[in-house]
Amino acid sequence: KSYFMGTTIEIIREYIEFSNLFGKNTENKIEEVLKEIEKKLDVKDKKACVVGVKEEGLFIESFEDNEIDFYSDNDALSQILGIQDIVIIKEENFKDEISKRLPVVARNYLEEGKSKNLWYEEVVPRESVFYTGVINSQHIDEFEDFCKKLEENLVQIGANATIGYGFTKFEEVK
């Protein structure tokens, strides 16, 4: 695998609470899994837990082999979150990793070949997953059409469309 989707137990619980507001009722299915992963992370010196089968030669940047544990039953978590290849990181380590690992891109506004404004941007890595809710209790037909268009098309969020950033695919979590 070339990358894993990193998250924390706290973020997953926030997602479950959020999705329950929309009637998804996923808490019972996943809470036992989260408790098992928490037990693995409570062990001294453990900083991350890979959800999936242990693979020979697996390397997760920033973590030594003895700092990583494995949780082999990834079906429930992957189905609820809609993603595969997950690594759960302790909250304090996650914050540190994010602050060190977000790509920073230097940008420069040029006017007639001369620099007028140099600035730096942190960008969210490709394949990042976000969640949001969309509700409408009125105008059901228009709402269904809106949701269909969201799922069928890429949506550009934020600036930087000209350099390929911000293109987003919306999918309903089932």
Please annotate each region the language model reported.
Residues 1-174:
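Basic, Gly/Ser/Thr-rich N-terminal segments that form RNA-phosphate-binding interfaces in CRISPR RAMP
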